[in-house]
Amino acid sequence: MKVNKEEYRGDYGEISLQPESLDDLWHLKYIVEPGDTVFAMTFRAVDSVSDKIRPDKVEKKLVRLGIKVESTEFHKFSNRLRIKGTIISDLDAGAYHTLNIEPYSELSIAKHWKSDQIERIRDAVEASKRPEVEIVTIEEGEAAIGYLRQYGIEEVSRIRQASSGKREGADARSVDGRGEFFGEVAAQLKYADKVQTIVVAGPGFIKDDFVKFLRVNHPAVAQKVIVEDTSSIGSSGFQEVLRRGAIQRVAEENRITREAQLIEALLSEIAKDGKATYGFAETKRAVDYGAVETLLIADETLRGLREKGARDIESLMRDVEHARGKVVVFSTEFEPGQRLEKLGGVASILRFPIGGD
């Protein structure tokens, strides 16, 4: 994310941004909300003399347009954020229009800013400077490759070894015996030239043999590899990599690693009826006691409450910050955020237990 300009009067201000990736569009989904004013370049139909002669032909020109936001939609697979609202100026004021924001589009957002939204922009700017990571989880005959994004791990490829011509014994366990399979896996490392780190993980010794294969056949890629033990591959293997801290060793401030560790700490405290709360009412009680060390909120829960105009959540976050606690907004596109949402979307890790009523 790139910030081009910021202007504030109190908590109201306008920020000019340039998203640079799919991750940045995902962040904007939770920054732009109903009632905001957004300006961006867009195509609009314009009247001309030729239109009157040939009414079936509509000319469109690129113009800068401002809309009052009603809704947003994040389209991961088409690489865009759609912002729908009513035009605030021009001859078509009041008409509906949708702004399609893509990577490297520029937009300006004018609104009453909340502290977590400003922090989210700062995080996105910092995240663009961090190393990106590709993860290979591999076992006998099968591998899954994932790309670490700020909103979670996206599985980009799965490779299965052909069942025909299977080898047995020592030959099956040799690097040569797996050469074709390893070659297919290496060919699917689509981001190898882009990322700074590749985590190779899985059960047994096959991951080590795959790294040996890379050293011989793809030495530049092998230089980026770190190896991690996991008991499985695919989604559960990706989560093991995160829990074991492999990603944290690469980028200690990575959002996903932090959320995975926080949710584990929360669930551990809940299991022993210790220093934790979940659900809005119980968490608010802990905030009133000044007991909250870290407030955990699912992004979809926060977004939904704000769209309904609920102010309790804003005061809850503000009270935690005033008491020198931390507020962490979780991504619900990633497993820890989904688990938090199942607990009501709001929870806390406490400085001290508060007990029951």
From Swiss-Prot:
Q: Which cysteines are joined by disulfide bonds?
A: none
Which co-factor is required? a divalent metal cation
Q: Give the principal location in a single coarse category.
A: cytoplasm
Q: Which GO terms describe its biological process?
A: nonfunctional rRNA decay; nuclear-transcribed mRNA catabolic process, no-go decay; nuclear-transcribed mRNA catabolic process, non-stop decay; ribosome disassembly; RNA surveillance
Instruction: Tell me its EC number(s), please.
Output: 3.1.-.-
**SUPFAM superfamilies assigned to the protein according to its UniProt record, in alphabetical order:** Dom34/Pelota N-terminal domain-like, L30e-like, Translational machinery components
Top-level EC class as recorded in UniProt = hydrolase
Which keywords, in A-to-Z order, does the entry hold?
A: Cytoplasm, Endonuclease, Hydrolase, Metal-binding, Nuclease
Cellular compartments per GO CC: cytoplasm
> Is Metal-binding among the key words of this record?
yes
GO terms for MF: endonuclease activity; metal ion binding
Q: Where in the cell is it found?
A: Cytoplasm
**Family annotation (Pfam families):** eRF1_1, eRF1_2, eRF1_3
Q: Which family does it belong to?
A: Belongs to the eukaryotic release factor 1 family. Pelota subfamily.
Which proteins does it associate with, and in what oligomeric form?
A: Monomer.
Q: What does the comment on domains in this protein's record state? A: The N-terminal domain has the RNA-binding Sm fold. It harbors the endoribonuclease activity.
Q: Which HAMAP family match?
A: PelO
Q: Which PANTHER family match?
A: PELOTA (PTHR10853), PROTEIN PELOTA HOMOLOG (PTHR10853:SF0)
Q: Say what the protein does.
A: May function in recognizing stalled ribosomes, interact with stem-loop structures in stalled mRNA molecules, and effect endonucleolytic cleavage of the mRNA. May play a role in the release non-functional ribosomes and degradation of damaged mRNAs. Has endoribonuclease activity.
The protein here is known as Protein pelota homolog
- Gene source species: Methanocella arvoryzae (strain DSM 22066 / NBRC 105507 / MRE50)
Which lineage is the organism of this entry classified under, starting from the top rank?
A: Archaea, Methanobacteriati, Methanobacteriota, Stenosarchaea group, Methanomicrobia
Its gene is: pelA
